Swiss-Prot record:
UniProt keyword Flavoprotein, yes or no: no
Protein name stated in the entry: Cytochrome b
Source organism: Phyllomys brasiliensis
Membrane-spanning residues: 33-53, 77-98, 113-133, 178-198, 226-246, 288-308, 320-340, 347-367
One BP annotation, GO: mitochondrial electron transport, ubiquinol to cytochrome c
Topology of the protein relative to the lipid bilayer: Multi-pass membrane protein
Cofactor(s) needed for function: heme b
Cofactor descriptive note: Binds 2 heme b groups non-covalently.
Pfam families with a match to the protein in the record: Cytochrom_B_C (PF00032), Cytochrome_B (PF00033)
Length: 379
């Protein structure tokens, strides 16, 4: 008799994805982030569902409903802070996951990579709309500033902004629709994750050497299930310490002040995980130019398979490219810091230089370096 996990129509899908999946024998801890992201997504959906049971999407009661969750609901504070800090963990893992993809040349699986880029945009949209829901000062002004960027689109811009707002400013209609979208988008993300995995399992996983590993594969279970559980353990320890010891470490204090349309905060800034893109947006004096740069700062990832000039897939054996990638990481950290600073000298200049170097490294210097490395290896 055939084993049920290999014959049952539903269980065999799980079996081919998580149990008998042939996996390269040499993938490192950098390949743990996929499962960690899946766990984060599940955690966000569960905590979000419980928060939605107590939250009211109305401008008059939204702020006090969040206060009510923290003060009166059993373990409400824990659910709220798990959801808020879980989002930060989600983005940390996302950036590590993308970084690993760039380092080891995983972007050559174009379908998987492009679905991943669309996923990144969707997750960013979800996080932005979630940040608006507590209806604090930064929620309100963040929503006003970011949605207002769409007015830079020629001809249809101003109409589009009012259409998104549901009126002539960010108000009750905006909050209600943002809550609706914030609730539904994670389920769309889950569906897209399944497509992401479907494309990945068509080709099989990449590995640190960047060489085809069909001759050296091992079953996913028990080897990588154990490895993933260890990663999850580290994640939960870190997240628990963050929630229980310093839950507001990554939160803007301005968001503990109820939204007031008549009082603008001194520095409007998004959550830390959007600061690098925000710095790129601010570094261009022209509104439309800034919006294009903002979108392209993420969309540039789609170009990576096209501008890959190296004869090798991975950066494991390309020291110059490695060095450049770490310069890019440092550059992104500088952009993140600049995004949190006021718009004044010297931050404007630093932001502009960091923005230029960000695009130059990816579009010009990295492909040129890869080409040079080919010549050095007489390829």
């Amino acid at each position: 008799m055939t084993n049920i996990r290999k014959s049952h129509p539903l269980i065999k899908i799980i079996n081919h994805s998580f149990i008998d999946l042939p996996t390269p024998s040499n993938i490192s801890a950098w390949w743990n982030f996929g499962s960690l992201l899946g766990m984060c997504l599940a955690l966000q959906i569960i905590t979000g569902l419980f928060l939605a049971m107590h939250y009211t999407a109305d401008t008059t009661t939204a702020f006090s409903s969040v206060t009510h969750i923290c003060r009166d609901v059993n373990y409400g504070w824990l659910i709220r802070y798990t959801h808020a800090n879980g989002a930060s963990m989600f983005f940390i893992f996302l950036y590590f996951h993308i970084g690993r993809g760039i380092y080891y040349g995983s972007y050559t699986y174009t379908e998987t990579w492009n679905i991943g880029v669309i996923l990144l945009f969707t997750v960013m949209a979800t996080a932005f709309m979630g940040y608006v829901l507590p209806w604090g000062q930064m929620s309100f002004w963040g929503a006003t500033v970011i949605t207002n960027l769409l007015s830079a689109i020629p001809y249809i811009g101003p109409t589009l902004v009012e259409w998104i707002w549901g009126g002539f400013s960010v108000d009750k209609a905006t909050l209600t629709r943002f809550f609706a979208f914030h609730f539904v988008l994670p389920f769309i993300v889950t569906a897209m994750v399944m497509i992401h995995l479907l494309f990945l399992h068509e080709t099989g996983s990449n590995n640190p050497s960047g060489v085809n590993s069909d001759s050296d594969k091992i079953p996913f279970h028990p080897y990588y299930t154990i490895k993933d559980i260890l990663g999850l353990l580290f994640m939960f320890i870190t997240l628990t310490m963050l929630i229980l010891f310093s839950p507001d470490l990554l939160v803007d204090p301005d968001n503990y002040t109820p939204a007031n349309p008549l009082n603008t905060p001194p520095h409007i800034k998004p959550e830390w995980y959007f600061l690098f893109a925000y710095a790129i947006l601010r570094s261009i004096p022209n509104k439309l130019g800034g919006v294009i740069a903002l979108v392209f700062s993420i969309l540039i990832l789609v170009l990576l398979p096209i501008i890959h000039t190296s004869k090798q897939r991975s950066m494991s054996f390309r020291p110059f490219s490695q060095y450049l990638l770490w310069i890019l990481v440092a550059n992104l950290m500088i952009l993140t810091w600049i995004g949190s600073q006021p718009v004044e000298y010297p931050f404007i200049t630093i932001g502009q230089l960091a923005s230029i170097s960000y695009f130059c490294i990816i579009l010009i210097i990295m492909p040129a370096t890869s080409y040079m490395e080919n010549k050095m290896l007489k390829w």
